[in-house]
Design a protein with these regions (language model features):
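Short, small-residue-biased leader/transition segments that mark boundaries at the very start
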Residues: 1-4
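Short-chain dehydrogenase/reductase
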Residues: 6-10, 46-68, 90, 117-121, ...
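Conserved Rossmann-fold NAD(P)-dependent oxidoreductase catalytic core, especially the SDR/UDP-sugar
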Residues: 13-57
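NAD(P)-dependent short-chain dehydrogenase/reductase
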Residues: 58-61, 65, 72-83, 87-118, ...
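Alpha-helical substrate-binding/gating segment
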Residues: 101-109, 116-150, 158
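C-terminal amphipathic/interface module of NAD(P)-dependent oxidoreductases
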Residues: 136, 169, 190-222
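Mid/C-terminal beta-alpha module of Rossmann-like enzyme folds, strongest
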Residues: 137-187
Length: 222
């Protein structure tokens, strides 16, 4: 299933490339690729910037690596390529934040090992604005689309609690215990890529390009 998903992602880019290539006088000046910070491995100590040389790793890392390799081929068509490595997108209208708010109705939630995993996130409004910023300023190359101030998963839970106006009681589950069911059903990569995601990703490059965040920290989200 994983290989099928990866192939579908890459094949869609190949199809788009061939369509544009057939148009000798195409007027496509820029392609903005929605990539992911999943290209970076989990780490308790490193801060990742765009210069990091990713190696073959877990499923999500491999998908993103192949995706970014394929998108660079559009340069051959004299098209400016902008790759945005998107972090965890936060919005009260959908995604993980909305799910956490819904879960908070139970007033009980589980975190892994105290919820200290680093979460490199971005508010959906900033993400939309960064796409616009990339077009207006003709950005080229790879940029991390993340907030300048990453948070822990526990802080994300606390934000959901604040937005739902309900106090939340967190229970910490040891990683060694939670990993067992994922290992038994053969989706260990999903556990490391999503459930136990822990990566500190730098926003310095997009900030230095002139972008000003509306939501530089979780405290701004209300």
């Amino acid at each position: 299933l994983g290989d099928v998903y990866k192939r579908q992602r890459i094949d869609s880019l190949s199809t788009l490339y061939q369509i544009i290539k057939r148009e000798k006088n195409h007027n496509v000046s820029q392609v903005i690729s929605a990539s992911a910070i999943g290209i970076y491995p989990n780490s308790k100590t490193l801060e990742y910037d765009e210069s990091f040389q990713s190696k073959e790793g877990l499923f999500l890392t491999n998908v993103v690596r192949e995706w970014e390799k394929k998108i660079k081929e559009f340069n051959k068509l004299n098209i400016r390529v902008t790759t945005l490595r998107i972090g965890l997108v936060l919005s009260k209208e959908g995604g993980i934040l909305k799910k956490l708010i819904q879960i908070n109705k139970l007033r009980i939630s589980n975190v892994i090992d105290g919820g200290e995993q680093c979460q490199s996130w971005i508010h959906i409004d900033d993400l939309v604005n960064i796409f616009y910023h990339a077009v207006q300023n003709k950005l080229e190359g790879t940029y991390n689309a993340v907030s300048p101030n990453p948070s822990t998963f526990l802080e994300l839970q606390e934000l959901a609690s604040k937005l739902s106006y309900k106090p939340l009681l967190n229970f910490s589950i040891p990683k060694s215990l939670l990993i067992v069911p994922f290992k038994l059903i053969g989706i260990l990569d999903f556990y490391y890529d999503v459930i136990a995601s822990d990566k500190n990703v730098s926003a310095s490059k997009i900030v230095n390009s002139g972008y000003h965040f509306n939501y530089p920290s979780m405290e701004k989200i209300k």
